[in-house]
Regions:
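Short, low-complexity N-terminal intrinsically disordered segments enriched in polar/charged residues
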Residues: 1-28, 128-134
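Hydrophobic pocket/interface hotspot
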Residues: 7-10, 22-26, 30, 46, ...
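A solvent-exposed, acidic/Ser-Thr-rich amphipathic alpha-helical stretch
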Residues: 23, 27-77
Length: 134
């Protein structure tokens, strides 16, 4: 299976709620970086940190959170996914949609680095009851 096929499979698994399959692509030493301004901003080291710091929170704090890619750029060991986030933040009951870019770096068929790019203001509007949605 190519690196591109592996990353496509990650998004398919995430959409189905199959988090163990998402974690399986990760190297034990993965660096996973969430964008500054995103609710879970920072760099997480290792699959367990990603599970606890990102995925478990997405599952408990959001209704219908989705990350749907619409385009991939295949650079061999570097795969870029372009897509759209959507979801409703439970605490405010506010929804959002925002375009994302995810940059994946793979080594020996495992993801060693993930970097998220997103317009975090669109996300913050869902988190903050006082901020208007566009």
């Amino acid at each position: 299976m190519s690196n591109l096929d592996k990353i496509k499979a990650v998004y398919d698994a995430f959409a189905k709620g199959d988090i163990p399959s998402v974690l399986e692509i990760m190297s034990p030493d993965i660096d996973w970086t969430e964008a500054e301004g995103f609710p879970y901003a920072g760099t997480y080291h290792g699959p367990r940190a990603v599970l606890e710091g990102v995925f478990m929170r997405l599952g408990t704090e959001w209704k219908g959170f989705a990350a749907v890619p619409h385009e991939f750029v295949d650079g061999g060991d570097t795969i870029v996914a372009l897509g759209k986030y959507s979801g409703t933040y439970k605490a405010t009951n506010k929804s959002f949609q925002a375009d994302f870019a995810h940059v994946w770096k793979l080594r020996d068929g495992k993801a060693v680095r993930f970097v998220q790019y997103v317009d975090t203001l669109l996300v913050q509007r869902a988190l903050d009851a006082a901020l208007p949605n566009p």
